[in-house]
């Protein structure tokens, strides 16, 4: 399914399966509302986040301190995570770890939290509820919720599995590739707006 979210119904919007006429300059707000819904429904690819992103890396959470917002690193400049099974802070490159995406921890007298904790705190704000965003974007609440639901269904119930061996960035070999047949092409819209 091809959904076009654009203020005007020209070009690719005219041939899309569905066109959503959005108020100019609010596409970032719309995307935040989609993310809000996906977080609420727990439709998150945790394995992907764990393996291929820095969302579980610890961040200094010390407002007013010079290290606030920076990644916590060890003496060798290696990013750190909190391991749920070992109940301790480890290097992100450590093997046999189960990183936490949530929580607050102490590292050398500093408060640190996983980056995902900060992301969810921001994106689960009432500001991004579809009921609030609908009035600002001109896209109805039920449509925002439906689009989020369709993204989740396609990503998690229609995944693609390819029997192709590959090696990831950490040198770990895999016997198959998992694909989530969902994408978004934002063109210049999101980068050119303040929301």
Question: Model regions: which residues?
Answer:
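Acidic catalytic cores of enzymes that act on phosphate-bearing nucleotides/polynucleotides
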Residues: 144-195
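Long, well-ordered, tryptophan-enriched scaffold segments
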Residues: 8-14, 18-166
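Short, acidic/small-residue loops that bind anionic groups at enzyme active sites
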Residues: 1-8
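Structural beta-strand/beta-sheet cores of well-ordered domains, especially the beta-sheet scaffolds
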Residues: 1, 18, 180-182
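Generic beta-strand/beta-sheet core signal
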Residues: 5, 22, 185-187
